[in-house]
Regions:
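Pocket-lining segment of extracytoplasmic ligand-binding domains
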Residues: 77-79, 87-89, 117, 153-251
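Proline-centered flexible-loop/turn and helix-kink motifs
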Residues: 46, 155, 217-220, 268, ...
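Bacterial lipoprotein signal-peptidase II cleavage site
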Residues: 2-14
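A local structural motif
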Residues: 16-18, 42-54, 148-162, 175-178, ...
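Soluble non-cytosolic domains of exported or imported proteins
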Residues: 28-32, 56-59, 116, 134-141, ...
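Extracytoplasmic/secreted envelope proteins and their assembly/folding machinery
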Residues: 31-38, 59-62, 98, 122, ...
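Short, glycine-/small- and polar/acidic-enriched structural segments
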Residues: 11-126, 131-134
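Segments of small-molecule ligand-sensing domains
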Residues: 236-282
Length: 282
């Protein structure tokens, strides 16, 4: 927080506690949820001035946290793992002091293709144009790790480093064969493609998921239920990472406790901001 008032302003109330919340892009799930969280904190913790800001999502948010530019950040637990261990995009740049405040909901690694591609399994990716996410992003690490579980390396495919917005357009235009997107489902961008095209979600088979989890403990298995997307008539097995709220060890315990208490006492406000919050449990 910030220091107290100066001498001549004794009549003013105690200094406000500014809480900056790092979210993600304005079209994602973090941004509306961050706005809802700011609202909850402002209404439930006296003297708090909380605000959400749009950012470049998980990787950027870890850096904002470690630089002290924000107090709370929405991040994926896999990115937190890389930061704490100094691996992947944090190789040689280990971040000390990251702490989890709350685990929110699963972010499903969704592998999207169109029916006409003929792709039914990740094993079919050889020689195909695959959008793996922006270079150095969490999605890209997910894509690489899942393909690795199937014995497929970047050399075996035509790698396209595209954000999911770009990948969605490329899929529709026939410029990529499949794309990875890591986001709470249902994901608006996939729903959008599915209204005009026959979308197929490529599963991650149970044995491959088990191998993945053994190597990368931040993954969990889940099912994308039939009917999640237009014309999706069967359940699809998938893996997910988790969205979490992270702080640093600079935040005092009382503040952290007050934030968690306010959040869990007002989950309805989070749920009204985005349906992904329906999966948050106390």
């Amino acid at each position: 927080g910030c220091g107290g008032g100066d001498k001549k302003d004794d009549k003013k109330p105690a200094a406000q506690k500014f809480i900056n919340i790092a979210t993600g892009g304005t079209s994602g799930t973090y941004f509306p949820l961050g706005g809802a969280l700011a609202d909850i904190l402002n209404k439930n913790i006296p003297g708090t001035n909380a605000s959400a800001q749009s950012t470049g999502a998980s990787v950027a948010n870890v850096n904002l946290l470690s630089q002290g530019k924000v107090e709370i950040a929405f991040i994926q637990n896999d990115i937190a793992y890389y930061a704490a261990n100094g691996t992947e995009m944090f190789k040689g740049k280990q971040v000390a002091g990251l702490q989890g405040l709350a685990t929110l909901y699963p972010e499903t690694v969704q592998i999207v293709t169109l029916k006409k591609s003929g792709i039914k399994s990740v094993a079919d990716f050889k020689g195909k144009r695959i959008a793996v996410g922006a270079a150095g992003s969490g999605t890209e690490a997910n894509a690489r790790q899942i393909m690795e579980a199937y014995g497929i390396k970047y050399d075996d495919i035509k790698v396209q480093y595209l954000s999911f917005g770009e990948a969605a357009s490329a899929l529709k235009d026939g410029n990529v064969d499949a794309a990875f997107v890591t986001a709470g489902h249902p994901t608006a961008a996939i729903q959008d493609i599915a209204t005009q095209n026959d979308v197929v979600l490529v599963p991650v088979d149970a044995d491959k998921a088990d191998a993945l989890i053994k190597k990368y403990p931040f993954y969990t298995k889940l099912v994308i239920k039939a009917g999640t997307y237009p014309k999706q008539d069967a359940d699809v097995t998938a893996v997910a990472v988790k969205c979490m709220l992270a702080v640093t060890d600079k935040m005092d315990e009382n503040t952290a406790y007050a934030i968690a208490k306010a959040l869990y006492g007002n989950l309805d406000r989070m749920k009204s901001a985005h349906s992904a919050a329906n999966a948050i449990s106390k």
